[in-house]
């Protein structure tokens, strides 16, 4: 077996997991949806179980339990720690409390960023509620709309599992709320790529949306998810795979630029907003325009993160 084949097999093995109770999606890179099967397989450490029990009894335990999870070394470990807490909160109808606690942890420097964790919480909330409208109404635009994105992503996957994806109308009822509607368009893109694992097919599916802005926001979600799907790899495999997330895609120049910018943005999440580490990923993209777009995406994410630390 050559090194490239071995690396591909390792990437698929590291990424393999059940999403929203459905089989891994086509294309070898599974979706990032719910982890109910994973919870049953992995269980939770005794200290985490105690934290969940006292979560709603002792107010300070909310920040403590979340900060304990945030202190874990990798995104995958953090997510596994947080998921049982998120499910407990969703079942207790305390979505706002979780989101406000996450933003507080960002402001105080305990948590590097809460956007991806809010994505994850959105997945869990939808799984518990089973309704896009109810899940969207339970939360808010905290963590740069991450919660909204996650809810819609999960809703698309759920609809696909029942064979009835019709994204043209999924966000219609949110048109009176500009933030939620914009986040819904973007979340559709995340969800589409989770369903089919194919960037070009997902981009075509976005074309069914009613307006140019809606379509582009959907494509933006596809391109962001295209880089996010490497986040759970160990660093060695992340370095080998993430820089090439856009290689071989027949995108327009503008979309290719955005795709490469997402490599830099997501590298900032992977490296907890270490700009130099993200730049190392960008320098491996393989061409000057791609490298530059990637570095721009990393810089823009740094600015966004700094603002979030000030305002939540």
List the predicted regions and their residue ranges.
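N-terminal intrinsically disordered, acidic low-complexity segments at the extreme N-terminus
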Residues: 1-27
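N-terminal cationic amphipathic segment used for targeting or macromolecule association
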Residues: 4, 14, 42-44, 265
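N-terminal non-cleavable signal-anchor helices
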Residues: 19, 30, 48-51
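Short, aromatic- and cysteine-enriched interfacial helices/patches
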Residues: 29-32, 57-59
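N-terminal Sec-pathway targeting helices
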Residues: 31-45
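Hydrophobic membrane-insertion alpha-helices, especially the h-region
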Residues: 41-55
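C-terminal region of N-terminal signal peptides and the immediate post-cleavage residues
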Residues: 52-64
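Non-catalytic all-alpha helical scaffold/repeat segments
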Residues: 61-312
